[in-house]
């Protein structure tokens, strides 16, 4: 829950001086990105802006305290202030901030600005006491805020110090309105008005001006003069003499003499006890003082001018002026040191009763009351955990003695889950083992349910570490003993069980487990696990060959992300990536590329290494289009990320796929052979991850002419794929088997493998997997179509594949580009005619298109030149090749390709 007083604009106090000269300056606030009120304590910063804000409608106010240095807390309150200002216009940003579902503060602000782009009219956000922020992450985010905020949004910042936000840059660009100490200091007229409102005996104008000059217009000093002059044997002049030359750091003695010592003992005790609260209401005052009339006492202090003011329109919440609050806390520590822990204990109880556990924790920590801290955690820790209050929980667990932690095993479990959630995976088992050992030493019983909770977490750690056998045993044991009430651990154990089946290739068992995980996670609002379960379901369906069902499952995942505002989580990139994979398989290349690019956008706030698989997808899109240069650029980026980084084998496999295809297309056997020597060769191929790695190996073996080795690999892959019903892998494997048989002159077996692959594609929808095989595939498909050897569906798919090969590849890309031509002209067997009369680059392109079966008009359209120009090119290249007819040119091109090892 958010404390209302932190989001309420201060009520305009009675008897305050209206600062007309400053309000005139503030009338132009909307013309600036930032209005900065920067001066020491006690000059009326908050009062001035409260006066100005009284006439503003669309304004949010955020009053900071020391606890706001936590980025998550800062973000939640800032967005809440905007929500109050806009009447709930930014609901998505609010949900994201409350659930901490954002990659960084800057990413959250970017989402906020998207929603505010649809807001019409001026909008204002006041952040009071920004000097309390010392967290660099917040400063960096606010620099982003100032650079990108909408034109109609003005930030008003109140601070005792100059905030490190690039203020100079705003000043140069005339985007800063700045008011400092000189402007806020009271002038003679304002000082006269001030004393007229507060003194029973008016001061002469000359006396008032003199007092103002002696304290240099410092509003707090003027207030203290007025307060002191009410005391017997005191005068405004005597107070001014004492205050002259003082500043906020030297006020303690004066405040003791002129304020605390002048009130009765009950009022003094009341003030000191209340000082432990950062904000207060009647219920909290009753807890701390035992007085039933807390609200009346606060109102009476306000009337006396004792530096207390209302924080909201309802008058329920009060706070002390920051200067006075600091002074009172110091005096409380001095005068009530023995009572202070008891006061914080009472404050914690008060906040707990109001439903604010985070504030209660602040006081429990201040009291050093580990027993109370433990009780708060036992009651609220998992709620805080599920709201991602990880930093606060860590602070609490550090404060608890370890003996107290192990006496409450659920807190030891929480400590381990905290490490898991903060990606400190290596610490989780160590923490659990230490806790179990300590409990055994102290003879603290570990019942079956607690053991099952530990096992569920250990199972998650094991599957993350690539230990499926260990994970399966732990998850199975956990599910035996976990009651339905322990839903979170049951969700974890069920998810791990499904993932283990997935890794073992037991897809028919994995899918229902992941569907069950999704249902439980949705029921208990564990939406991260619901999304993970949908992603796993999609991957399982892809492996089974049901790509359309996978696509529809992905739609459900996109809906969940939208409904629960999960757009900034890395799992969103995972979803976009597997969507890209499906679209690529179907040769919807533009959409596949768009999905991969969106995935990279999601990861902009994370480590660049996480972009590896999306970059690999972009490389595959370029390869399917026949754009080798672009593909190579993405491949180089992938290689740069892989250099010096540690990746899971699945990631390496996916990154290597475009590399091996690129080497095949360009004939780079040296790079291929070097890769093969270093490539990891898994012991099994029982799932689609491992099948993919062995397929990469087999492709390189075929390219290097190591046909026997490749055949052994492919036979085992196909056997496993059939046994485990890995339909998509079987579809891909058969295409490689086809290439192997074709290159070893086993045309009948090649045809059989191709026909089965086309048949499987009726289920998978594969197109691009055929297209990337290029001319070898095109030749075979032409033959099958001419022989009319295919059923209707397969015939239609073959024609579509052939069309894509002709459209995207054009066979200039691998065979007739500049690299190929350079290699050809230096080949010892190149025909002398070509060596002495080489074709131009354009003529090589035309030859490639002729070889691909393009007509003259199609070639003209492809190269965007006139048909007569194409005829000239054809005539020239016929002459240079020594041929007279198109078929002769095709045969000559075929011989050149064979000579270079491409066909």
From Swiss-Prot:
PROSITE patterns: HTH_LUXR_1 (PS00622), HTH_LUXR_2 (PS50043). InterPro entries: P-loop_NTPase, Sig_transdc_resp-reg_C-effctor, TPR-like_helical_dom_sf, TPR_MalT, Tscrpt_reg_HTH_MalT, Tscrpt_reg_LuxR_C, WH-like_DNA-bd_sf. Keywords: Activator, ATP-binding, Carbohydrate metabolism, DNA-binding, Nucleotide-binding, Transcription, Transcription regulation. It comes from the Bacteria. Pfam families: GerE, TPR_MalT. Residues 832-897 form the HTH luxR-type domain. SMART domains: HTH_LUXR. SUPFAM superfamilies: C-terminal effector domain of the bipartite response regulators (SSF46894), P-loop containing nucleoside triphosphate hydrolases (SSF52540), TPR-like (SSF48452). ATP binds at residues 39-46. One of its GO terms (biological process) is positive regulation of carbohydrate metabolic process. Signal peptide: none annotated. Transmembrane segments: none annotated. One of its GO terms (molecular function) is DNA-binding transcription factor activity. Activated by ATP and maltotriose, which are both required for DNA binding. Residues 856-875 bind DNA. Positively regulates the transcription of the maltose regulon whose gene products are responsible for uptake and catabolism of malto-oligosaccharides. Specifically binds to the promoter region of its target genes, recognizing a short DNA motif called the MalT box. Belongs to the MalT family. NCBIfam families: PRK04841.1. Monomer in solution. Oligomerizes to an active state in the presence of the positive effectors ATP and maltotriose. This is HTH-type transcriptional regulator MalT.
């Amino acid at each position: 829950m958010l404390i209302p007083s932190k989001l309420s604009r201060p009520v305009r106090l009675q008897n305050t001086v209206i600062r007309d000269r400053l309000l005139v300056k503030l009338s132009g606030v909307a013309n600036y990105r930032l209005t900065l009120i920067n001066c020491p304590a006690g000059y009326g910063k908050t009062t001035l802006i409260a006066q100005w804000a009284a006439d503003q409608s669309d304004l949010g106010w955020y009053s900071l305290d020391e606890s706001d240095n936590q980025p998550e807390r800062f973000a939640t309150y800032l967005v809440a202030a905007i929500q109050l200002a806009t009447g709930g216009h930014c609901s998505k940003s609010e949900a994201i901030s409350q659930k901490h579902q954002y990659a960084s503060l800057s990413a959250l602000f970017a989402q906020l600005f998207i929603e505010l782009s649809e807001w019409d009219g001026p909008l204002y956000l006041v952040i009071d006491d920004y000097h309390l922020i010392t967290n660099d992450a917040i400063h960096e985010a606010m620099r982003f805020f100032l650079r990108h905020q909408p034109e109609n949004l003005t930030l008003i910042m109140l601070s005792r110090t100059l905030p490190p936000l690039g203020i100079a840059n705003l000043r140069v660009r005339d985007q800063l309105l700045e008011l400092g100490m000189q402007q806020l200091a009271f002038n003679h007229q304002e000082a006269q008005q001030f004393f007229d409102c507060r003194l029973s005996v008016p001061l002469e104008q000359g006396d008032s001006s003199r007092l103002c000059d002696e304290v240099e217009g410092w509003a707090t000093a003027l207030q203290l003069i007025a307060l002191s002059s009410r005391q017997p044997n005191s005068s405004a002049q005597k107070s001014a003499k004492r205050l002259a030359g003082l500043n906020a750091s030297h006020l303690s003695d004066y405040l003791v003499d002129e304020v605390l010592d002048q009130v009765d003992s009950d009022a003094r005790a009341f003030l000191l006890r209340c000082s432990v609260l950062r904000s207060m209401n009647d219920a909290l005052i009753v807890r701390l003082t035992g007085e039933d009339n807390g609200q009346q006492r606060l109102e009476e202090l306000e009337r006396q001018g004792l530096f207390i003011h209302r924080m909201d329109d309802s008058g329920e919440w009060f706070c002390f002026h920051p200067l006075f609050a600091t002074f009172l806390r110091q005096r409380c520590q001095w005068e009530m040191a023995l009572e202070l822990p008891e006061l914080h204990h009472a404050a914690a109880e008060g906040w707990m009763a109001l439903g604010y556990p985070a504030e209660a924790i602040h006081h429990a920590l201040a009291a050093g009351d580990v027993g109370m801290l433990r009780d708060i955690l036992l009651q609220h820790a998992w709620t805080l955990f599920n709201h991602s209050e990880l930093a606060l929980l860590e602070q609490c667990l550090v404060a608890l003695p370890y003996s107290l932690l192990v006496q409450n095993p659920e807190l030891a479990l929480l400590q381990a889950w905290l490490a898991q959630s903060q990606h400190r995976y290596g610490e989780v088992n160590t923490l659990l083992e230490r806790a179990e050992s300590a409990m055994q030493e102290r003879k603290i019983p570990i019942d079956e349910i607690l053991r099952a909770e530990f096992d569920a977490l250990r199972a998650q750690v094991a599957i993350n570490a690539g230990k499926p056998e260990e994970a399966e045993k732990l998850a199975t044991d956990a599910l035996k003993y976990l009651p339905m009430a322990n839903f979170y651990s049951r969700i974890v154990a069920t998810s791990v069980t499904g993932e283990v089946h997935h890794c073992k290739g037991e897809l028919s068992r994995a899918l229902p487990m992941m569907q069950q995980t999704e249902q439980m996670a949705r029921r208990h609002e564990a939406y991260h696990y619901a999304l993970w379960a949908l992603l796993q379901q999609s991957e399982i369906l892809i492996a089974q060959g049901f790509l359309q069902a996978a696509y529809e499952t992905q739609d459900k995942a996109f809906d969940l992300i939208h409904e629960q505002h999960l757009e900034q989580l890395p799992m969103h990139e995972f979803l976009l990536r597997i969507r890209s994979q499906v679209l690529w398989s179907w040769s919807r290349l533009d959409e596949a590329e768009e999905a991969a690019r969106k995935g990279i956008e999601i990861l902009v706030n994370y480590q660049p290494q996480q972009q590896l698989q999306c970059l690999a997808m972009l490389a595959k899109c370029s390869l399917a289009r026949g754009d080798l240069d672009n593909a190579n650029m993405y491949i180089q980026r992938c290689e740069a990320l892989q250099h010096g980084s540690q990746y899971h084998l699945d990631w390496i496999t996916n990154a290597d796929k475009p590399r091996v295809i690129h080497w095949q297309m360009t004939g780079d056997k040296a790079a291929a052979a070097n890769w093969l020597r270093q490539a990891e060769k898994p012991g099994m191929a029982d799932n689609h991850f491992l099948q993919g790695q062995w397929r990469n190996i087999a492709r390189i073996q075929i390219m290097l002419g190591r046909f026997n080795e490749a055949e052994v690999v492919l036979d085992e892959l196909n056997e496993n794929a059939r046994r485990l019903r890995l339909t998509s892998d079987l579809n891909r494997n058969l295409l490689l088997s086809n290439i192997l048989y074709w290159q070893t002159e086993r045309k009948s077996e090649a045809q059989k493998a191709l026909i089965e692959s086309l048949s499987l594609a009726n289920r998978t929808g594969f197109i691009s997997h055929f297209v990337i095989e290029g001319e070898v595939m095109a030749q075979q498909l032409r033959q099958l179509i001419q022989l009319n050897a295919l059923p209707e569906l397969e015939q239609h798919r073959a024609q579509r594949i052939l069309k894509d090969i002709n459209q995207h590849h054009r066979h200039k890309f691998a065979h007739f580009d500049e690299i190929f031509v350079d290699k050809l002209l230096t080949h010892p067997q190149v025909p002398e005619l070509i060596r002495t009369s080489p074709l131009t680059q354009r003529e090589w392109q035309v030859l490639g298109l002729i070889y691909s079966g393009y007509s003259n008009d199609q070639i003209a359209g492809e190269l965007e030149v006139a048909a007569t120009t194409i005829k000239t090119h054809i005539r020239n290249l016929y002459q240079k090749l020594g041929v007279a007819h198109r078929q002769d040119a095709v045969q000559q091109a075929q011989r050149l390709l064979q000579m270079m090892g491409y066909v």
